[in-house]
């Protein structure tokens, strides 16, 4: 596999370890995500998938390791990153409208002193239309379905016009129409040169939705192009041998980072 310079990686993680009450949650994690790809993080419950996103964004203290975004510390590139959290992490009863939630996405570029102007408000309306929620502009978010709520948060991320998007289980609990809308949005963002890192749980759609995959179970099991890394061997190792063998495309291992090359594997 051809070498890629550090500055060509959207995300580079080296030797990251994170513990909670002295129990490792992530252990000796290395990640390399090239720019302009859609990469899934998959693994069983408790594997550390959401934790890895938060660790990269500096939301959790590291026991050791280094994180770089576009070749620099995350704190230096924070404004180039957008985050879509799990729906369960959001207080949907907060009294605010669809438009106001999406408009919040502009605060990162404006700061907390400047107020959104005509340009920002027009972009918020455009993003709401882009995710198919134009008819719900003034609707309270508490009145929306789960799929509609997810679309609103995707619109807020669009307003940020980030270069790197972190999405934590965006497909969880949504209807089929919303799922396809999310897939279309991911591919649209990729077409604009954006990079997307998505925590994902449905193994049946990995090969269809993503370019690359990171298999995680406290440690990195493998990372690379879907055709190379999403194989029966690596997935069974990540999930403890509990997965049907009918899921996997036949590929090669030329473009895959195998954790066994430099560390012990679960």
UniProtKB/Swiss-Prot annotation:
Gene label: troB
Family, similarity comment: Belongs to the ABC transporter superfamily.
Alphabetically ordered keywords of this record: ATP-binding, Ion transport, Nucleotide-binding, Transport, Zinc, Zinc transport
GO molecular function: ATP binding; ATP hydrolysis activity
Protein name: Zinc transport system ATP-binding protein TroB
Protein source organism: Treponema pallidum (strain Nichols)
Residue span, ABC transporter domain: 11-243
GO biological process: zinc ion transport
Xref: CDD domains: ABC_Metallic_Cations
One Pfam family of this chain: ABC_tran
UniProt: ATP binding residues: 43-50
Function: Part of an ATP-driven transport system TroABCD for zinc.
């Amino acid at each position: 596999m051809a070498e890629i310079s550090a500055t060509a990686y959207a995300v580079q993680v080296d030797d990251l370890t994170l513990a909670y009450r002295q129990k490792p949650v992530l252990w000796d994690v290395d990640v390399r995500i090239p720019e302009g790809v859609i990469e899934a993080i998959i693994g069983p419950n408790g594997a550390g998938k959401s934790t890895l996103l938060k660790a990269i964004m500096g939301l959790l203290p590291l026991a050791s390791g280094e994180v770089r975004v576009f070749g620099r510390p995350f704190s230096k590139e924070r404004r180039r990153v957008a985050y879509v959290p799990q729906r369960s992490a959001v207080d949907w009863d907060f009294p605010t409208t669809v438009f106001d939630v999406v408009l919040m996405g502009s605060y990162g570029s404006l700061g907390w002193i400047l107020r959104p102007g005509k340009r920002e408000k027009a972009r918020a309306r455009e993003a709401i239309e882009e995710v198919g929620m134009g008819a719900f502009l003034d609707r309270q978010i508490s009145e929306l379905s789960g799929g509609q709520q997810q679309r609103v948060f995707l619109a807020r991320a669009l307003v940020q016009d980030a270069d790197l998007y972190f999405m934590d289980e965006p497909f969880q609990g949504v209807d089929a129409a919303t799922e396809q809308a999310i897939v279309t949005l991911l591919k649209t963002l990729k077409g604009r040169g954006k990079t997307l890192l998505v925590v994902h749980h449905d193994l049946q759609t990995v090969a269809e939705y993503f370019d690359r995959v990171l298999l995680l179970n406290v440690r990195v099991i493998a990372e690379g192009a879907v055709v190379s890394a999403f194989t029966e061997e690596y997935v069974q190792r990540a999930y403890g041998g509990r997965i049907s063998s009918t899921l996997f495309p036949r590929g090669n291992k030329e473009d895959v980072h195998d954790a066994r090359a430099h560390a012990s594997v679960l």
